[in-house]
Amino acid sequence: MTNGSTEDNSYRYTPGLAAKIEAKWQKHWADKGTFNAPNPTGDLAEPGAELPEDRKFIQDMFPYPSGVGLHVGHPLGYIGTDVFARFHRMKGANVLHTLGYDAFGLPAEQYAVQTGTHPRTTTMANIANMERQLGRLGLGHDKRRSFATTDTDYYRWTQWIFLQIYNSWFDPEAKNANGTLGKARPIKELEEKLAAERADWADLSAAEKQEILDSYRLVYRSNSTVNWCPGLGTVLANEEVTAEGRSERGNFPVFRKNLQQWMMRITAYSDRLIDDLEYLDWPEKVKSMQRNWIGRSRGAEVTFDCLGNDIDVFTTRPDTLFGATYMVLAPEHELVDTLVAQSGNSSSGSDAYTDVDPRWTYGQANPAAAVEAYRAAIAAKSDLERQENKEKTGVFLGVYATNPVNGAQVPVFIADYVLTGYGTGAIMAVPAHDSRDFEFATEFGLPIVPVLAPEGAEAGAGEQGGAELTEAFTEDGPHINSNNSDGLELNGLGKAEAIDKAIEWLESKGVGSGKIQYKLRDWLFARQRYWGEPFPIVYDEDGTAHGLPEDMLPVELPEVEDYKPVSFDPDDKDSAPQPPLAKAKDWVEVTLDLGDGEKTYYRDTNVMPQWAGSSWYQLRYIDPNNDNALVDIENERYWVGPREGRPSGGVDLYVGGVEHAVLHLLYARFWHKVLFDLGVVSSFEPYYRLYNQGYIQAYAYTDSRGVYVPAEEVTERDGKFFWVRKADDAEGVTKEEEVFQEYGKMGKSLKNAVSPDEICDDYGADTLRVYEMAMGPLDTSRPWATKDVVGAQRFLQRAWRLAVDENTGKGSVSDDALTDEDLKALHRTIAGVHENYAELRDNTAVAKLIEYVNYLTKTYSAGQAPRAAVEPLVQMLSPVAPHIAEEMWEILGHSEGITYESFPEWDEKWLVDDTIELPVQVMGKLRGRINVAADASREDIEAAALEEPNVASHIEGKTVAKIIVVPGKMVNIVAK
């Protein structure tokens, strides 16, 4: 459908004319390199040019080159950042704004598998299509800086960063350049340190030294519990697993399995990752999400003895130890099998449970059988599903541990809600004061001992056994039932003092110590896929890992015919990963000289996770063609280095969805901090300001089967919705079926996606840009309605007519001077639009532009609007509708483009009202309104208020006792 008028105006702003204008200016910008931002040094520098002090690095989150292309929701953030970038160019800033593609990873690989073509082929085709679609929108990107993570020249440096992290260790005592303790140092320095401090270092074998050094590295191999998905044939990160324990991609079952995997020691940076959030201009919601994910908590590590084995638990409330009546270990805890073997008289845990509550046995005859059955039952549960723990389940191990504060023998269980990666993988359960522990204790008939009482309760309330407790008391209160004969007395104390005393006692007895703990776990950094960055690691005949020297980079991903992952029966939890690269035998086995002669080595057949390429891409945007360094530090310092009031440095504006609030941003911050510690960059944070854009949503429709039907074929009638289409068996005959409306995401699978190509064809790219920016605040979600797009088109048509004669296509303005009313309207618009653009409130900027265009249209007939009123309009319009603004600017006689034209300035005197309206109250009730001069005296205001007819009638016959004048606000008359 085309929304053009049928009037025969050759230069009317129709979709056809818009298309010609947009193609013209997009070619002009590309030919001239209009948006190229110069660097201080290197191949992107402009010799002899003096760079502006004001520079802005504006970055969008990496898009994934999807095979289905874009819908109108995808460009929302890209248009928003383009408006911001164009505005700052007009303010004189050197603006770096570009866009690359995050092209490795499971989505691209699975799409390639589905279509039967190589992932590189489909990925490059998808990128080309996305570039075409985005190109139509007139985004002002410096295309010299664009790349894909799949480019060999790019992932060479991803591999280089991996090696820097691999060849580093974290020294908690070293002061970093930011002045705080803890930093990454080269592993060579650790080797020198150990050689100087350890008398036996010289006597150790090379393998022994290597093993010690490897235990310190920031990248290490570990036997860890991972999410194994047989149906996909790969290990998944936690974020790739749904709450139901299935893969986000493909919806296959996921099982917990112990495998040797590459891990990154992100936990070493826990404190800095939390503390440095204070330097950043991020939404508080995102900061809170990161703090919660890292989960720093202060408490104590306490040791419970169990048959000569130490069970260590971390607790934030050591003051409640007297209420610990049982213990729970993660089913995967390293002590479980040992403790089971020590239960009863057997060496295997096969002795039958004796005098044990049947609820504790999981329906099995002995602890060994119960543990085996329980582990099998929970194998498919995700961490999230386990922590939700809706149904309380567990197994008694047949052993008891000793509570260190009172000597009580407490039963030891395993339960799925305790995870190995959190804390120590074991907890002390205080059911009287923890809801989850209370539910477990109630389910299993365990004792509940209150050790905290509500304020004002009797000291003896809630004797041991807690019979009167119907739920956990989770608030704070004075301690009860909390003393022993060995010097620990907590009764009557508040929380803080009791915690301190408990830790002091534990430390004095050697059964505990104060400690800071974190929920954050090290980063699982390997995938059993083909489409990813190969590891720059080889193994010798003994299986020892060796990082490759830099001159052997990049390790290129081999071109193979069989790139599909080795998948298994989705329910085969006993299967093991077989990475696709293992099939490339000639690539895997190599002869290399790593310093001690040529030897046979074997490449690592895993690939890096998709997060790798997006963890540092902002740095490569700065210096994309540098063959000698990841980034020249002079260029890095210019664009993202520390500035006054911004010691962290970082990208000026980073825009993307809140779904990346934790993982991507956490990983990027971690990598950046390591690079900072190693002197590669001058900034210690990658992104100074973060902005989360909202989403464009849409209505979708389902039939009686719950199947989605095409939204464009649905009509509404009498509050109901009907799918109207041609019947399958009769040409020309329509079939109608009632369907049901739902509101939410836009997407191809929901059959409600609207292509930006369609809107550009029917209305023009500038109309799409204006509509999306006008729909609502950029950081909130909003509903798409194609029928409303025409409003944005009509606004641009009115603006066009103010400057252009629709019959001749020539400029059509007058040289008349502006009236006072014109000046007020103009300067208020300039001030408001300037403020709105600067604060990313583009919807209100568009509203002000519409209001100003309406004012000029009503005030002046065609061709009569003053140039001095129209040209500032075109300048203000340029960031949001750049093509039409460029064309209008040229038609008005300017030979230079508008991109770098200065944004208009306002005069404060035109922002002040000559007169103001004040409400007048009599005895607190509104009785009238008066208009007075803005600078009217108090006496004049009082006189005007008393003369207002309705006010006068309400005080007639009364004595005015007082007149209260609140300047600029109101008048209140007290009359009796």
From Swiss-Prot:
Its main location: cytoplasm. GO terms for cellular component: cytosol. ATP binds at K748. It catalyses: tRNA(Leu) + L-leucine + ATP = L-leucyl-tRNA(Leu) + AMP + diphosphate. The keyword Zinc-finger does not apply. GO terms for biological process: leucyl-tRNA aminoacylation. It is found in: Cytoplasm. SUPFAM superfamilies: Anticodon-binding domain of a subclass of class I aminoacyl-tRNA synthetases (SSF47323), Nucleotidylyl transferase (SSF52374), ValRS/IleRS/LeuRS editing domain (SSF50677). Its EC number is 6.1.1.4. A motif ('HIGH' region) lies at residues 63-74. The keyword Cell division does not apply. Belongs to the class-I aminoacyl-tRNA synthetase family. PANTHER family: LEUCINE--TRNA LIGASE, MITOCHONDRIAL, LEUCYL-TRNA SYNTHETASE. This is Leucine--tRNA ligase. It comes from Corynebacterium jeikeium (strain K411).
